[in-house]
Amino acid sequence: LDRIKQTLDKPREVLTLDKPHRLVTIPFDQIEYVEIVGKTLHFMLLNNGEESIKAPLRDYEEKLLDRPGFFKTHRSFIVNFTNMRELNSDTFISMSKRNVPIARGLRKEAKDAFVRFLFEDADRR
């Protein structure tokens, strides 16, 4: 019960997106993955949610990769391991069943990082 209370009392950590005429906050734990398409950065969220912003990936890359569980799988994608349900040889599958590619040169590193994250997460519980 104490662990549940601590979780509920803990403020949610959020990423702030600077959109035209407004600021939008996204809890980090709601992000499945981030994808850049053209000049638009798409934040794919749990339950098939999405927030988009006109910005390069590099504007948010450091903020994401500095957090535990975030990993760059490809020049256009960053995943949140917390919200990945499956890892295939070349793809992560998110909780919302969306496919996220893994660059050929990063497959072993992605697998190792994902397994390490899963074991570290289990140790925290």
What positions do the PLM features span?
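Conserved binding/recognition cores within well-folded domains
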Residues: 1-95
